Amino acid sequence: RSSDLEGTIVNDEYFGKIPADRLIKENGIIYFKIDGLYRSKLGLPASRATDICGSYDSSKGVLTILWCSLPETPSVYVNGQWGPQEDPFAGDVINSYNDGPVEDGSIMGPFYEIETSSPGAELAPGASLVHTQKVIHVQGKDEQLVPIVQDLFGADLNVIKTKFQ
């Protein structure tokens, strides 16, 4: 959820604009269809990213929860866009990639991924930066997962399940 934050809600142009039937931004929640059938990637900029995100696989009843550490002060992130960039430190904190066929029909997966990035940092010798990411997969019946989704994301699992039908 990112309704109280400012700036671009989601960067959805890594491989061209993500079609509206695959990306919905509604009430502070981003719904991204991740089925391994359409190559696309999105990113959440630092002004919108929170320390938690997740995905739900309704066919297997698996909720994936990803927590990450965020810096206490505003930071810059390496830009993961392909090709030359005007600002190489205008990147995203959280990304999700959905694999799918490329122009020649080949495909690596199908698969999807969710990842987080640490701030881009020029460290002096001996200095360090710690970035922590934790991933938990919870498998269960919908009635068991509903309160978890509500508590962590402020979202209704039943709405999530029907968003792309």
Model-derived features with residue positions:
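A contiguous, surface-exposed recognition patch within enzymatic or periplasmic domains that forms
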Residues: R1-S128, P147-V149
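A short acidic/glycine-rich loop-to-helix N-cap element
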Residues: K141-L152
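Short, hydrophobic/aromatic-enriched beta-strand segments in well-ordered soluble domains
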Residues: A127-G140
